[in-house]
Design a protein with these regions (language model features):
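C-terminal motif of bacterial Sec signal peptides marking the signal peptidase cleavage site
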Residues: 14-17
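Asparagine-centered strand-capping/turn motif at beta-strand->loop junctions
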Residues: 56-60
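Short, solvent-exposed loop/linker segments at beta-strand-coil boundaries, enriched for Pro/Gly
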Residues: 70-89
């Protein structure tokens, strides 16, 4: 009796299995796709893209047969369906009811005639029960000038970078002479790439054609998070001066340095009165996994700049004369209201946005002034001045908005200090990926940094970072307030 029951059960299971394998040719039964358009952002020619995945799903009760899968052109895109990448073999593929297949897609683009990005499109066609269903493929192809070496080090005496096409740096690039970068030039930096410049540097962008240093990942980290929002993608830009050379001059205007480990590191071995000089203006240094701007034994003039969101100091100063006017220095890296950890290292709560080191005996004399700046962030002490005694520090703070304890009156006057109730300094101090809210350090309409600046200092800087005229009673920071559109 028991043996008969087992046989009956096996027969029933076989009947059910047979019913599940029924392949329907009903033309009303169609496939569903997790995406009907697959977009690859910028794909560098000859290098290929990352791989994207689409789920091909049969929502119906019965199995259906995919008669054929075709790519209309097949020049720029390659597919793999359920482990098969030979397009000629993609025929008579059965998908059971309520089952699915994985479709993998990659873009590979040959060199183009245009230097500007070119939109390339193709189409995947699924022939099912007399119907044709499509997945549209799109990619922006971009020619790039690659700089790389088998040794991992590329050395130039002098180097001029033009805006004819972007550059892609793979290795350590050392420029022993002069480095010149034309307006509108974009330099993509591969993981581990960095630049050492030992001579003069001239990098002059414009408001409409800035110079950009950024990582080379142009795809998505997650569905709603572009890779460009992840820090630590490349090493940094180092301007180095050795004691056996004449002091260098560095001029950087409208330069955006984004999402590296260290943004801009300027260092000199000299400790005397003659030091290298840097002018950094109308520029953004944002989202770095260690430091933003480091100045050691350098005379610097920094104005109309945003230096923001670094895991360690946004600004570190030690040795030299540093003049900061109308800058926004905002340290909200990994702020608690951020819904996704897209950063690559641990944030120390006791690290200030600005750290001025007046303790080291092996540096030039440190003299720093901050006028009409914003220095704030997630930490209670966003400004630290390390000095043996306040009267030993030769610096000044005037017309600033500061998140710190009150500074010594010997070097500070007419500043506004943040209170715990100041929650609206900027438009946005967090990142919510699903709502596409990203950090925005333009001033809020109720910002306590509005109208607090010193008007005399502004005479030398009549416009803000984006070219807007400053008011008679100027706002602190690099952005003059405007109503949000």
């Amino acid at each position: 009796m028991r043996k008969g029951c087992y046989i009956l059960l096996l027969l029933l299971m076989g009947l059910v299995a047979c019913q599940q394998e029924i392949v329907s040719n009903d033309p009303s039964l169609k496939l569903q796709f997790s995406h009907d358009t697959v977009l690859f952002d910028t794909v560098f020619t000859t290098l290929g893209s990352s791989t994207k995945c689409v789920l091909v799903y049969n929502p119906n009760k019965n199995a259906i047969n995919i008669d054929q899968v075709e790519i209309r052109d097949g020049k720029h895109f390659f597919i793999n369906l359920d482990g098969e990448n030979n397009i000629d073999q993609l025929r008579d593929i059965v998908i059971r009811g309520k089952d699915s297949l994985f479709l993998f897609i990659k873009a590979q683009i040959d060199p183009l005639e245009e230097n500007n990005p070119v939109l390339l499109e193709d189409d995947i066609a699924f022939r099912v029960n007399g119907n044709i269903q499509h997945i549209n493929l799109q990619a922006y192809g971009q020619n790039v000038e690659k700089i790389r070496s088998d040794s991992g080090l590329v050395i130039y005496h002098n180097l001029s970078l033009t805006n004819e096409r972007p550059y892609l740096l793979y290795d350590t690039v050392a420029v022993t002479g002069n480095l010149a970068i034309e307006e509108g030039t974009t330099i993509y930096m591969h993981a581990g790439a960095l630049i050492y410049a030992y001579g003069n540097v001239i990098a002059k962008g414009t408001k409409d054609q800035p110079i950009i240093f950024r990582g080379d990942r142009t795809d998505m980290l997650f569905d709603s998070v572009p890779y460009r929002m992840a820090s630590g993608q490349w090493e940094g830009l180092y301007l180095m001066h050795t004691a056996d050379r004449l002091p260098s001059t560095y001029t950087l205007d409208h330069v955006n340095i984004l999402s590296g480990s260290i943004g801009l590191y300027v260092y000199s071995e000299a400790t005397g009165s003659i030091l290298p000089k840097i002018t950094l203006s109308n520029s953004k240094i944002h989202n770095h996994s260690i430091y933003g701007l480091v100045l050691q034994n350098v005379n610097a003039k920094v104005y109309n700049c945003e230096i923001s969101n670094c895991a360690s100091y946004c600004v570190y100063l030690s040795g030299g004369k540093h003049d900061f006017v109308h800058n926004t220095i905002a340290a909200y890296y990994g702020y608690p209201y951020t819904d996704l950890n897209i950063h690559n290292n641990i944030i120390a709560d006791d690290v200030a946005a600005v750290y001025i080191n007046n303790l080291s005996k092996n540096t030039a004399k440190t003299v720093s002034s901050f006028t009409n700046c914003i220095i704030t962030g997630r930490r209670k002490q966003s400004l630290m001045v390390a000095t043996p005694l306040p009267e030993h520090y030769e610096g000044s703070f005037e017309g600033n908005y500061l998140r710190s304890d009150s500074l010594h009156e010997a070097f500070a006057k007419n500043n506004v200090y943040a209170s715990d109730s100041d929650s609206c300094v900027f438009r946005n101090i967090y990142y919510l990926s699903k709502q596409y809210h990203y950090y925005d350090f333009h001033l809020d309409s109720l910002s306590p940094a509005r109208g607090i600046g010193d008007s005399i200092a502004t005479l030398s800087y009549p416009t803000d970072m984006v070219g807007l005229p400053r008011k008679n009673k100027p706002d602190a920071g690099c952005y003059e307030y405007v109503e949000e559109l």
